[in-house]
């Protein structure tokens, strides 16, 4: 029996793909299919969650010289 799922095609570089896979490992069910090294098919209702998690992860790696510690 076939099951259809709505998905969104994501094109990204391999480093961002690795981050999305990391996000999927912590909250599974986001990635429907890994197509190749630069394309993923993710659930359509998880797009905003993936964007916010990517922004959170990437903001950790930005150096701001004006930010007080």
From Swiss-Prot:
It is found in: Nucleus. Keywords: DNA damage, DNA repair, Nucleus, Transcription, Transcription regulation. SUPFAM superfamilies: TFB5-like. One of its GO terms (cellular component) is transcription factor TFIIH holo complex. PANTHER family: GENERAL TRANSCRIPTION FACTOR IIH SUBUNIT 5. Component of the general transcription and DNA repair factor IIH (TFIIH) core complex, which is involved in general and transcription-coupled nucleotide excision repair (NER) of damaged DNA and, when complexed to TFIIK, in RNA transcription by RNA polymerase II. In NER, TFIIH acts by opening DNA around the lesion to allow the excision of the damaged oligonucleotide and its replacement by a new DNA fragment. In transcription, TFIIH has an essential role in transcription initiation. Belongs to the TFB5 family. This is General transcription and DNA repair factor IIH subunit TFB5.
